[in-house]
Each structure stands twice: as structure tokens, then as C-alpha cells.
Amino acid sequence: MIGRLRGVLVEKQAPEILIDVNGVGYELQMPLTSFYELPEVNHETMVYTHFVVREDAQLLYGFITKQERALFRLLIKTNGVGPKLALTILSGMTAGEFVGCVERDDIVTLVKLPGVGKKTAERLLVEMRDKLKSLMEASAGSEREFVLQSNYSPAPTVNSAEEDAISALISLGYKPPQASKSVSAAYKEGMDSETLIKAALKSML
């Protein structure tokens, strides 16, 4: 199993990246919370990975922290949640925010994420409660530490903020008209794409 990669970031287009490790290029998909912590292209980076083997493909998922990867692994063990939906959930909110939703039984916020219906949200709240407790105990011994380690201070991003934001939202499962409308409504002069995506997502939750 590939558990971690360190190499040069060759390409990045949310939610996918390409890392060159000693001449071998690895394609990964990442939640936006991790994606926007990456350095600029042609700089070295390190990501924790989760490897998925399917009949028709072999896929790598990347994460900036072990905590986010651990939460991803718990999510895909939930009935009805596959890697794609888990990635969408972790792109729509930080790991810490997800923990908060589970703690509060906040089904209203969860169902606003693309692909998360009422039944799926209910399963997440029920099945993740005990799993999260074990995860937090294993990672740091407290919810507070887990939440602190799972939230990021976003790095500056690229130009064409509106185009990048719309593309990222579509990749998460939002319909193009909805993505475009939300991005346009949230945009303010000088916003970078990461800030704009967060603002657009917040307006839809």
C-alpha cells in the first residue's frame, strides 16, 4: 500500500494533482481543504495517501494531514458512502466542521452537501459517532486537538478565481448553473479562488 508520497508538484487542477517522485508521476484526487494547502507547481510537497483498487481502475487519494485521511477512511466504511462522496464531504467542510455536525446531530447542514440525502446523512450521524470517538482518542486524546489539527489556514491560490471556483464546484457534484450562480453572487473584487469557493459553498449550506 502507498501510504505517503514526497516529490515535486507537477500539475494541480482541483481536485486533481500530479506529483513526480523520482521520475514517476502519481495522479491523486484531494479534498479542497487539502488541495488549497499545497505549494505552487514545481515545488516539493508531501501528502498522505489512501489507495483504492477497483475492477476498472486504481485510484490514489491525497491528504495534507493524517487526521483528514483517517476521517476519509472512516467515511468510506459508512454504508452508502464511497470515495467520491467522502471526497465531496471533506471538500464541503473541514474535518473539524464535520465532527461538529456529528456532535450536534446537524442533519440540516449535511444534506446541503451534493450527493448527501436525508438517509445518508442519518447514517453518517449514527455510524460516525462511535467511530469518531475512537479516532479522536487515537489521534490526540481529545476532540479539541483533533479539530485543531484538522483545520487549515488556506494558502494563496491562482488567478482566474471565478473560473477555477466554478470548475471546482462542478467537480464536487454541483450543477453548472448552480455553481456559476453561487460563485457570481459570492465574488468580491480581489478574492482568490480558494476564498471564493469557500464563500460560494457557505452560501449554499
UniProtKB/Swiss-Prot annotation:
Residues 157-205 are annotated as: Domain III. Pfam families: HHH_5, RuvA_C, RuvA_N. GO terms for biological process: DNA recombination; DNA repair. Residues 65-143 are annotated as: Domain II. CDD domains: UBA_RuvA_C. GO terms for cellular component: cytoplasm; Holliday junction helicase complex; Holliday junction resolvase complex. Keywords: Cytoplasm, DNA damage, DNA recombination, DNA repair, DNA-binding. SUPFAM superfamilies: DNA helicase RuvA subunit, C-terminal domain, Nucleic acid-binding proteins, RuvA domain 2-like. It is found in: Cytoplasm. It comes from the Bacteria. Residues 144-156 are annotated as: Flexible linker. Residues 1-64 are annotated as: Domain I. One of its GO terms (molecular function) is ATP binding. Homotetramer. Forms an RuvA(8)-RuvB(12)-Holliday junction (HJ) complex. HJ DNA is sandwiched between 2 RuvA tetramers; dsDNA enters through RuvA and exits via RuvB. An RuvB hexamer assembles on each DNA strand where it exits the tetramer. Each RuvB hexamer is contacted by two RuvA subunits (via domain III) on 2 adjacent RuvB subunits; this complex drives branch migration. In the full resolvosome a probable DNA-RuvA(4)-RuvB(12)-RuvC(2) complex forms which resolves the HJ. Has three domains with a flexible linker between the domains II and III and assumes an 'L' shape. Domain III is highly mobile and contacts RuvB. Belongs to the RuvA family. The RuvA-RuvB-RuvC complex processes Holliday junction (HJ) DNA during genetic recombination and DNA repair, while the RuvA-RuvB complex plays an important role in the rescue of blocked DNA replication forks via replication fork reversal (RFR). RuvA specifically binds to HJ cruciform DNA, conferring on it an open structure. The RuvB hexamer acts as an ATP-dependent pump, pulling dsDNA into and through the RuvAB complex. HJ branch migration allows RuvC to scan DNA until it finds its consensus sequence, where it cleaves and resolves the cruciform DNA. This is Holliday junction branch migration complex subunit RuvA. It comes from Shewanella baltica (strain OS155 / ATCC BAA-1091). The lineage of its organism: Bacteria, Pseudomonadati, Pseudomonadota, Gammaproteobacteria, Alteromonadales.
